[in-house]
Amino acid sequence: MANLGYWLLALFVTMWTDVGLCKKRPKPGGWNTGGSRYPGQGSPGGNRYPPQGGTWGQPHGGGWGQPHGGSWGQPHGGSWGQPHGGGWGQGGGTHNQWNKPSKPKTNLKHVAGAAAAGAVVGGLGGYMLGSAMSRPMIHFGNDWEDRYYRENMYRYPNQVYYRPVDQYSNQNNFVHDCVNITIKQHTVTTTTKGENFTETDVKMMERVVEQMCVTQYQKESQAYYDGRRSSSTVLFSSPPVILLISFLIFLIVG
């Protein structure tokens, strides 16, 4: 965030300085002034705009990071592993024709975020597995079900599957999805071990998992809110941003 503030300050100061110089610079051309009437032809300062039809940061018409019109990682228009457009082993220059493409680096920020929120479960489309919880003590309305629950609660889940809270519009949607995927995964896993669940088991699991999903939602919502508030505080309290705001106020008042 601090680096972003420095960049914003540098960009603003550069633009302000450039505007000031443009206002003070004498107009070229005219009789016996030694200047050209067409400032775009042969100007000694060169062209400040990107050459050869590319956009900013594209020196030869390619996309960002494409120096000669190829796609990402293709410096001369060839496919991956073809440095100069030829087939495999037909590239020219000093490139090593048998080099394998470098492995992509792991984004440590993403790994840290996933570890903080919960372990991402492979094969479940972005679901995460929450931390283990104590199974709640629930009363089902009659002594037989209460006793059955106490004797079998160890067979029910103590962790829930969920997606990030920012993918849901409200708590009900989060809890509904959380309960469904958790019971489904727990039932499939347990069934493969040779153990089946009765209707009573499913009924009790729904009550237990629902309470755990509500707890998980409250925990994730608080963490998400704290993260956004912390990011905003860091951005607006950084010295470059404060200096930039002070400078803008000075320009407006002055």
From Swiss-Prot:
Q: Where is the secretion signal located?
A: 1-22
State whether keyword Phosphoprotein applies. Answer: no
Q: In which tissues is it expressed?
A: Highly expressed in the brain, lung, kidney and heart. Expressed at low levels in the liver and spleen.
Q: Which domain of life is it from?
A: Eukaryota
Which intervals of the chain are annotated as region Disordered?
Answer: 25-104
Entry-annotated residues carrying Hydroxyproline: P44
Annotated Cu(2+) 4 binding lies at H84, G85, G86
What does the annotation give as the result of altering L108F? Linked to long incubation time
UniProt propeptide residues? 231-254
* GO cellular component terms attached to this protein's record: cell surface; cytosol; dendrite; endoplasmic reticulum; Golgi apparatus; inclusion body; membrane; membrane raft
Q: How does it sit in the membrane?
A: Lipid-anchor; GPI-anchor
Describe PTMs of this protein: N-glycosylated.
| Stretches with biased composition (Gly residues) | 54-94
sequence repeat placement: 51-58, 59-66, 67-74, 75-82, 83-90
Where does the UniProt entry place glycosylation sites? N180, N196
* Residues bound to Cu(2+) 1: H60, G61, G62
Q: Name one Pfam family in it.
A: Prion_bPrPp
Note the lipidated residues of kind GPI-anchor amidated serine: S230
Q: What residue spans carry the region label Interaction with GRB2, ERI3 and SYN1?
A: 23-231
Q: Report the sequence similarity comment from the record.
A: Belongs to the prion family.
Q: What does this protein do?
A: Its primary physiological function is unclear. May play a role in neuronal development and synaptic plasticity. May be required for neuronal myelin sheath maintenance. May promote myelin homeostasis through acting as an agonist for ADGRG6 receptor. May play a role in iron uptake and iron homeostasis. Soluble oligomers are toxic to cultured neuroblastoma cells and induce apoptosis (in vitro). Association with GPC1 (via its heparan sulfate chains) targets PRNP to lipid rafts. Also provides Cu(2+) or Zn(2+) for the ascorbate-mediated GPC1 deaminase degradation of its heparan sulfate side chains.
Q: What is this protein called?
A: Major prion protein
